[in-house]
From Swiss-Prot:
Similarity comment: Belongs to the disease resistance NB-LRR family.
Native species: Solanum bulbocastanum (Wild potato)
One Pfam family from the record: LRR_14
Outcome of substituting residue 305 to S: In susceptible haplotype
Presence of the UniProt keyword ATP-binding in the record: yes
Induction / repression: Constitutively expressed.
UniProt GO molecular function: ADP binding; ATP binding
Protein name, per record: Putative disease resistance protein RGA4
InterPro entries for the chain: Apaf_helical, Leu-rich_rpt, Leu-rich_rpt_typical-subtyp, LRR_dom_sf, LRR_R13L1-DRL21, LRR_R13L4/SHOC2-like, NB-ARC, P-loop_NTPase
Function: Disease resistance protein. Resistance proteins guard the plant against pathogens that contain an appropriate avirulence protein via a direct or indirect interaction with this avirulence protein. That triggers a defense system which restricts the pathogen growth.
Domain of life per record: Eukaryota
LRR repeat intervals: 526-548, 549-572, 574-595, 596-620, 638-662, 674-696, 751-776, 784-808, 829-851, 852-876, 878-900, 901-925, 927-950, 966-988
Extra remark: Belongs to a four-gene family located at the same locus. Although the four genes are expressed in the resistant haplotype, only RGA2 confers the resistance to P.infestans. In the susceptible haplotype, RGA1 and RGA3 are likely to be pseudogenes created by deletions and mutations, while RGA2 also contains several modifications.
Length: 988
C-alpha cells in the first residue's frame, strides 16, 4: 500500500512545487526536500512490502512512514485551500491571515521533516534492496472490450451432472426435507458449481420456484426469510415481525417443489438452523435445499444427504483455466512460456481461484524472466491458514502496477459479500487520491481503466450491469488478501474515512473507521477526513461544523430525514461527491452550492427538491447532476447547463418555464458522455404554447451517444426532427408519455439499436405506431430491426403497428403489451413470445392474437364488455405454455379452441365474475398441463370434465369459487374423482 500512496503524494508535491502559488507560502525548499526524501524511500518500498510479511519491525516502520505521508498530504491540502481563498479574496502577501498561516504551516513542515529524517535513517538498518516497479504496458495481443460474463468453467461438468441427478432422482423418495451440502475450501468454486446446477435446464424444469440466497456470516432467521420471500415475489415484503414473515413464506412454499440454494454458509449453531428448517418443511415432496460451505461441521449439522466434497481441479483443467486467463484468445502461445506455466500451475494446487489469479497477472507479460519470477518467488513458501491461498493471491497483488495496488486494497473497507457499484467505488478512489492523472483523461476515466484492469486480473467477479451501473463482488479469499494488506497501516492515527454503520460484522480497516452511531463530536475528532458516510443514520439535522472538514471530498448523506442542509457545507472547497439521494424530506439545497468548486457528482435522486440551486453552471467540474428544475429567474434557467460536461443521466423538468428556443440553449448536443435524458413539462403549467414548445424541444437535440430517451407531457403538435437514425443511432430505449397534441409518432422504426419502446397516453389522432415511409427521410425494409420489447398504453384510436405488414418488420420483437387500445389489431409477427393485453379490445383485435403463432405466454384481461371470446383466437397458438385470463367481468364461457393448446403448461383464470363453465368437451386436449389455478370466479359451477385424464397435472388451486369448492370436498365431493390424482391441491 505504501509505495502506491507515495507515488500519488510525489505527483502532488511536484505539482505543488511547480505552481506559482507556492511563492505565497515560501515552502519551495521544504517541498523539494520532502520530495527528495520520499523518492529515496520509495526506491526500497517494494522490498519492504515483501519483507514486512516476516518482520514485525519492518511492518512498524511502514506504519510510521504511512503516518508521515498522510500528514504531508494534509499539509498540501490545506495549502491548496488557503491558495484558493487567497485568490478569491485578493489579499496581499503581508495580510495578517496569510502571515499567520505561513507561520503555522512552517512549524508543521519542520516537525514533519524531523520525523521523515528519523524514518529515513531507520531504513538503513533493514538493508533494503532498491527495486523499481515499472508499470507494465499491455501486450499487443490483449483482448479488447470487457465482457460481463463469467469465463468458461473448466472441469466441473461431471460434478454438475452428478448433483443434478441426485437432486432430481434421489430426493423424490425422501420423507424429510432433503438438504444437500457442497463442502470445500475457499476458492474451489463451490458457488460457481452451485450456479451451474441452479441454471441447469433439468433443474429449471423440475423445480419451481428456484431461490438463491447468499447467507455469508449473518445467519439471521428473519433476514434469510425476508430475502427468500423477496426472491420469490420479486419485491420486498410489507411485514416486519418474524411471525408474519414465517407465515408469508409458508404460504408461498406450501405444496411447491422448490429448490433453495443457501450459498456460503458459516453458521454452525444447530438451534439456528433448526428454526429456519422448521419454516421450510411445507413444500411438496421433492423440494430440496442445496448448501455450500467451507466447514465440515456446517455440512454435518445441515445435511440430510451425504455431503459432496468438492475436489480440486485436475492438473489438465487447472492448466486450461490458467492458459485461458494468461493467453486469452491468442491461438499460438510461446512454448517456453507454456512450459513455465505448467510449473506455476502445480503451485496452484488445483484451486481454480489461484489459477485464474495467476493467469490474469501474467496476461500482460510475455518475457520468460517475468514468468520465471512468478514461478520462483519466495512468497509461495509462506505458511497458509486453514482455508487460505493468500500466498498465491499476495503474489498477484505484488505484480499489480502501482496505481492499481491501493485501489484494490481499499476494497477491504466493504464487508464480505457486498454487492459493490463500480461507479461509486471509483468516486471513493478519487476521494482518497488513489488515482494518478493520465494526460487529458478525466479521473473517472482513469478509475474505469483501473477497475477494468482489476477485473481482467480476476480480482472482481459476478459482474452485472443494471440501471446504468455496474455491480460486482469480490471473492472471499480476494477480500482476505485485501484485508491483510492493511496490517501495515492499521495503527495509523490519521483516520481518512468514517462509515457510520450498525452492521455487526463491519470492522475498521486501516485508515477507514467504522462507528456504530453518529454524534456531533465525531466531526471535531477526525479533522483529516476525506470520506464521511452518514447514510441511513436517521439524522434530521447536520451541524454547521461540517464546514470545518476542509479535506472532505466525499460526503454521503443519503437516506436521512434532513429538511435542509447548513450553508457552511459550501465551505468544503475539496468536496467532489455530495450524495443526498432518497432524503425524502429534503426540499432544498444550500443557496451557495455553486461555491463547491471541486464538486463532480451531485446525487439527488428521490429528493422532493422544488428548485435547483442557483448558478449551478459555475460548477465546471460537475459530471453528475441527476436532475435540473428549470426556473424563470436568472441563475435558474436552462442555460446553466450549457458549459457543464455532464455524464450518466439527467432529468430536466418544468420545461414549460422556458421562454423561447434561445433560452433553451443547454448545449446537449455537445454532451458526449450523457447516456440518459428525460425531458418533461408540467401538464398544469400556465401559458403553454404549442409552437413555442416545438422550438424548445428542437433546441434540446442530444448527442448521438445517447442511449435512453424520455419525453413527458410535451405540448407541441409534432415531435422534433432530431428523432431519426442519424442523431439517435445508439438509443436502445425510448419512452413517450402524455404527448397528447402530437398528431403522429416519430419514425422510431429507423432507429437501428432501439430495443425497448414504451408509448403511453397519446393523441386520439394516432392510428399507427409507424406511418408509411413516405414521411421518413430514411427508408429501410427492416423497420424496427432491433426492437425486443414494445409497450403501448391508452391510445384509443390505435389500429395497429404499421399500415403495411412485411416479413422484415419487427424481426426481433419478443415481448408486447397492448394496454387499453380497443381498436388494436395484431399483425403477423414471427418472433413474439410474450403478450399482455388489457382493456376492452374488440372482437377483431382478439381474433388477431392468433397471428402471433410463436407465443409462449399470454395474459389477457381487464375487459368489462366481452361476453365471449372468438373461437379463432387460439387456433394457431401451438407453442403457448402459459395462459392467464383475469378481470373479464361479463365473460360467461371459454372458447372450445382452448382445448387445442396441447403445449399449455399453466392455466390461470382469475376474477371472471360471470364465468359459469369450461368448454363442454372439458380440457382433455391440454395434455401438457401441469398447473391449473382458478380464483374468484363466483359463478363457476364445476371443474371441467376429463380433468382426471390429465396425467401431467401436478398442481391445482381453487379459491373464491364457492360452488366448485363444495364439489371438491375430499372423498365426498362431486368433483373429487376428477382431482384425486393431483399431488398438490390448494382448495380453500
Amino acid at each position: 500500500m505504501a509505495e502506491a500512496f507515495l507515488q500519488v503524494l510525489l505527483e502532488n508535491l511536484t505539482s505543488f512545487i511547480g505552481d506559482k502559488l507556492v511563492l505565497i507560502f515560501g515552502f519551495e525548499k521544504e517541498c523539494e526536500k520532502l520530495s527528495s526524501v520520499f523518492s529515496t524511500i520509495q526506491a526500497v518500498l517494494q522490498d519492504a512490502q515483501e519483507k514486512q510479511l516476516k518482520d514485525k519491525a519492518i511492518e512498524n516502520w511502514l506504519q510510521k512512514l504511512n503516518s508521515a505521508a498522510y500528514e504531508v498530504d494534509d499539509i498540501l491540502g490545506e495549502c491548496k485551500n488557503e491558495a484558493i481563498r487567497f485568490e478569491q479574496s485578493r489579499l496581499g502577501f503581508y495580510h495578517p491571515g496569510i502571515i499567520n498561516f505561513r507561520h503555522k504551516i512552517g512549524r508543521r513542515m519542520k516537525e514533519i521533516m524531523e520525523k521523515l529524517d528519523a524514518i529515513s535513517e531507520e531504513r538503513r538498518k533493514f538493508h533494503f534492496l532498491e527495486k523499481i516497479t515499472e508499470r507494465q504496458a499491455a501486450a499487443a495481443t490483449r483482448e479488447t472490450g470487457f465482457v460481463l460474463t463469467e469465463p468458461k468453467v473448466y472441469g466441473r461438468d461431471k460434478e454438475e451432472d452428478e448433483i443434478v441427478k441426485i437432486l432430481i432422482n434421489n430426493v423424490n423418495v425422501a420423507e424429510e426435507l432433503p438438504v444437500f451440502p457442497i463442502i470445500g475450501m475457499g476458492g474451489l468454486g463451490k458457488t460457481t458449481l452451485a450456479q451451474m446446477i441452479f441454471n441447469d435446464e433439468r433443474v429449471t424444469k423440475h423445480f419451481n420456484p428456484k431461490i438463491w440466497v447468499c447467507v455469508s456470516d449473518d445467519f439471521d432467521e428473519k433476514r434469510l426469510i425476508k430475502t427468500i420471500i423477496g426472491n420469490i415475489e420479486r419485491s420486498s415484503p410489507h411485514v416486519e415481525d418474524l411471525a408474519s414473515f414465517q407465515k408469508k413464506l409458508q404460504e408461498l412454499l406450501n405444496g411447491k417443489r422448490y429448490l433453495l440454494v443457501l450459498d456460503d454458509v458459516w453458521n454452525d449453531d444447530l438451534e439456528k438452523w433448526a428454526k429456519l428448517r422448521a419454516v421450510l418443511t411445507v413444500g411438496a415432496r421433492g423440494a430440496s435445499i442445496l448448501a455450500t460451505t467451507r466447514l465440515e461441521k456446517v455440512g454435518s449439522i445441515m445435511g440430510t444427504l451425504q455431503p459432496y466434497h468438492l475436489s480440486n481441479l485436475s492438473p489438465h483443467d487447472s492448466l486450461l483455466l490458467f492458459m485461458q486467463r494468461a493467453f486469452g484468445q491468442q491461438k499460438e502461445a510461446n512454448p517456453n512460456l507454456v512450459a513455465i506455466g505448467k510449473e506455476i500451475v502445480k503451485k496452484c494446487g488445483g484451486v481454480p481461484l489461484a489459477a485464474k489469479t495467476l493467469g490474469g497477472l501474467l496476461r500482460f507479460k510475455r518475457e520468460e524472466s517475468e514468468w520465471e519470477h512468478v514461478r520462483d518467488n519466495e512468497i509461495w513458501s509462506l505458511p497458509q491458514d486453514e482455508s487460505s491461498i493468500l500466498p498465491a493471491l499476495r503474489l498477484s497483488y505484488h505484480h499489480l502496477p502501482l496505481d492499481l495496488r491501493q485501489c484494490f486494497a481499499y476494497c477491504a473497507v466493504f464487508p464480505k459479500d457486498t454487492k459493490m457499484i463500480k461507479e461509486n467505488l471509483i468516486t471513493l478512489w478519487m476521494a482518497h487520491g488513489f488515482l494518478l492523472s493520465k494526460g487529458n483523461l478525466e479521473l473517472e476515466d482513469v478509475g474505469n481503466e483501473v477497475w477494468n484492469e482489476l477485473y481482467l486480473r480476476s480480482f472482481f467477479q459476478e459482474i452485472e450491469a443494471k440501471s446504468g451501473n455496474t455491480y460486482f463482488k469480490i471473492h472471499d479469499l480476494i477480500h482476505d488478501l485485501a484485508t491483510s494488506l492493511f496490517s501495515a497501516s492499521a495503527s495509523c492515527g490519521n483516520i481518512r474515512e468514517i462509515n457510520v454503520k450498525d452492521y455487526k460484522h463491519t470492522v475498521s480497516i486501516g485508515f477507514a473507521a467504522v462507528v456504530s452511531s453518529y454524534s456531533p463530536s465525531l466531526l471535531k475528532k477526525f479533522v483529516s477526513l476525506r470520506v464521511l458516510n452518514l447514510s441511513y443514520s436517521k439524522l434530521e439535522q447536520l451541524p454547521s461544523s461540517i464546514g470545518d472538514l476542509l479535506h472532505l471530498r466525499y460526503l454521503d448523506l443519503s437516506c436521512n430525514n434532513f429538511r435542509s442542509l447548513p450553508e457552511r457545507l459550501c465551505k468544503l472547497q475539496n468536496l467532489q461527491t455530495l450524495d443526498v439521494h432518497n432524503c425524502y424530506s429534503l426540499n432544498c439545497l444550500p443557496k451557495q452550492t455553486s461555491k463547491l468548486s471541486s464538486l463532480r457528482h451531485l446525487v439527488v435522486d428521490g429528493c422532493p427538491l422544488t428548485s435547483t440551486p442557483p448558478r449551478i453552471g459555475l460548477l465546471t467540474c460537475l459530471k453528475t447532476l441527476g436532475f435540473f428544475i428549470v426556473g424563470s429567474k436568472k441563475g435558474y434557467q436552462l442555460g446553466e447547463l450549457k458549459n457543464l460536461n455532464l455524464c450518466g443521466s439527467i432529468s430536466i423538468t418544468h420545461l414549460e418555464r422556458v421562454k423561447n428556443d434561445t433560452d433553451a440553449e443547454a448545449n446537449l448536443s455537445a454532451k458526449a458522455n450523457l447516456q440518459s435524458l428525460s425531458m418533461s413539462w408540467d401538464n398544469d403549467g400556465p401559458n403553454r404554447y404549442e409552437s413555442k414548445e416545438v422550438k424548445v424541444l428542437e433546441a434540446l437535440k442530444p448527442h448521438p451517444n445517447l442511449k435512453y430517451l424520455e419525453i413527458i407531457a410535451f405540448g407541441g403538435f409534432r415531435f422534433p426532427s432530431w428523432i431519426n437514425h442519424s442523431v439517435l443511432e445508439k438509443v436502445i430505449s425510448v419512452r413517450i408519455k402524455s404527448c397528447k397534441n402530437c398528431l403522429c409518432l416519430p419514425p422510431f422504426g429507423e432507429l437501428p439499436c432501439l430495443e425497448n419502446l414504451e408509448l403511453q397516453n397519446g393523441s386520439a389522432e394516432v392510428e399507427y405506431v409507424e406511418e408509411d415511409d413516405v414521411h421518413s427521410r430514411f427508408s429501410t425494409r427492416r423497420s424496427f430491426p432491433s426492437l425486443k420489447k414494445l409497450r403501448i398504453w391508452f391510445f384509443r384510436s390505435l389500429k395497429g403497428l404499421m399500415k403495411e405488414e412485411g416479413e422484415e418488420k419487427f424481426p426481433m420483437l419478443e415481448e408486447m403489451a397492448i394496454l387499453y387500445c380497443p381498436l388494436f389489431v395484431f399483425p403477423t409477427l414471427s418472433s413474439v413470445k410474450k403478450l399482455e393485453v388489457h382493456g376492452n379490445t374488440n372482437t377483431r383485435g382478439l381474433s388477431s392474437i392468433s397471428n402471433l403463432s410463436t407465443l409462449t405466454s399470454l395474459r389477457i384481461g381487464a375487459n368489462y364488455r366481452a361476453t365471449s371470446l372468438p373461437e379463432e383466437m387460439f387456433t394457431s397458438l401451438t407453442n403457448l405454455e402459459f395462459l392467464s385470463f383475469f378481470d373479464f367481468k361479463n365473460l360467461k364461457d371459454l372458447p372450445t379452441s382452448l382445448t387445442s393448446l396441447n403445449a399449455l403448461k399453466r392455466l390461470q383464470i382469475e376474477s371472471c365474475d360471470s364465468l359459469e363453465s369450461f368448454p363442454e368437451q372439458g380440457l382433455e386436449g391440454l395434455t401438457s398441463l401441469t398447473q391449473l389455478f382458478v380464483k374468484y370466479c363466483k359463478m363457476l359451477k364445476c371443474l371441467p370434465e376429463g380433468l382426471q385424464h390429465l396425467t401431467a397435472l401436478t398442481n391445482l388451486g381453487v379459491s373464491g369459487c364457492p360452488e366448485v369448492e363444495k364439489r371438491c370436498d375430499k372423498e365426498i365431493g362431486e368433483d373429487w374423482h376428477k382431482i384425486a390424482h393431483i399431488p398438490n391441491l390448494d382448495i380453500h
